[in-house]
UniProtKB/Swiss-Prot annotation:
Catalyzes the transfer of the enolpyruvyl moiety of phosphoenolpyruvate (PEP) to the 5-hydroxyl of shikimate-3-phosphate (S3P) to produce enolpyruvyl shikimate-3-phosphate and inorganic phosphate. It is found in: Cytoplasm. Phosphoenolpyruvate binds at residues 28, 100, 128, 175, 357, 405. 3-phosphoshikimate binds at residues 28-29, 33, 173, 175, 326, 353. It comes from the Bacteria. It comes from Rhizobium meliloti (strain 1021) (Ensifer meliloti). InterPro entries: Enolpyruvate_Tfrase_dom, Enolpyruvate_Tfrase_sf, EPSP_synthase, EPSP_synthase_CS, RNA3'P_cycl/enolpyr_Trfase_a/b. Gene3D superfamilies: Enolpyruvate transferase domain. SUPFAM superfamilies: EPT/RTPC-like. This is 3-phosphoshikimate 1-carboxyvinyltransferase. One of its GO terms (cellular component) is cytoplasm. Keywords: Amino-acid biosynthesis, Aromatic amino acid biosynthesis, Cytoplasm, Transferase. Pathway: Metabolic intermediate biosynthesis; chorismate biosynthesis; chorismate from D-erythrose 4-phosphate and phosphoenolpyruvate: step 6/7. Coiled coil: none annotated.
Amino acid sequence: MSHGSNPRPATARKSSDLKGTLRIPGDKSISHRSFMFGGLAAGETRITGLLEGEDVINTGKAMQAMGARIRKEGDTWIIDGVGNGALLAPEAPLDFGNAGTGCRLTMGLVGVYDFDSTFIGDASLTKRPMGRVLDPLREMGVQVKSAEGDRLPVTLRGPKTPNPITYRVPMASAQVKSAVLLAGLNTPGITTVVEPVMTRDHTEKMLQGFGANLTVETDAEGVRTIRLEGRGKLTGQVIDVPGDPSSTAFPLVAGLIVPGSDITILNVLMNPTRTGLILTLQEMGANIEVMNKRLAGGEDVADLRVRHSELKGVTVPEDRAPSMIDEYPVLAVAAAFAEGTTVMNGLEELRVKESDRLSAVADGLKLNGVDCDEGEASLVVRGRPGGKGLGKISGGQVKTHLDHRIAMSFLVMGLASEHPVTVDDATMIATSFPEFMGLMTGLGAKIEEAENKAA
């Protein structure tokens, strides 16, 4: 695990003419769910394109600990699932490392079973609140033991028979919605989730693909009601995981802000609940061509061609936040090179990510000469076209707080700043995008990692 290892700073320097074609690693959301649903479904599931970052592998290990058989042959992961309702009690605590998604979804999946399951994680995950997932599980009859503030370690024990509930999700959170639906898989009757604002819908699409009896209705106000019939049969599937739009964001923004760049990114997931960043960048004047649109496994996929663009500041509509919550750090970097002011509101979710992502972004921008204001749930960035004066002539490292997206965002910033940008640690990039350094330097980006000092 990289989180226990020595931090390894990295520095990005002004680059030009980033060029090439790349394939982004598989989508993290779909990869987590592929392991989970494949491990739960009866029969064999085959997965290609899986994101093999630490977070997803930890989800796979958790499914193995509960009875799924998982092996890799060539580029294909093959899972023999246990069958819905047939998970086994894990003999040891389930360690999710840094993976909030894997941890919260698995709590829903296994929490309603009539046995004890214990969840642990790394220092970053142990600080993150789990109450939003634990509250609906309590309503279903699950007994919860947790550290103060509903934090890890958490031990769950389901009732003899869980109660199906109707749960209105109090905030825009795909993780909470998904956890309740997954708990509903082993609950008799109909479990209903009411979602006031649509969030990423991979759980619904994929559960339907695996054979769950799940329906979605959307009313005139956009409120979605999702109903799942519990204890039905799930059957193994063949899945080709499309490229992760959140990882795509880094080479995409690099191509926009580095002069002379022309990059093509293949096989990108274009699910409408995930494309807020692309839409926002296009509104800022980004030259992004969407090519070869197609469907893969019920999901929209396309190739993107991105070229260097003169960006202009915009006000991002607040209701777009759920569709790009993970992309605000790298959007803030793009805004630092745009003409004028970019205003981002509705960012309260960023306070409870791997780090307090909002203050981490604002602090990193200020350190590197960007004029910005951090509000309670907002960020205002006043850009400097061409990156004049941005970066650091000497010393000064961006504090990443063990957060992979902060690290990658600021390394992208350094590629177009007048002076270099250094992050205090790049080891945790492996949690979501292990190939980041290799792909970026392959395009011509000047990024160097510090040598590992002997411990």
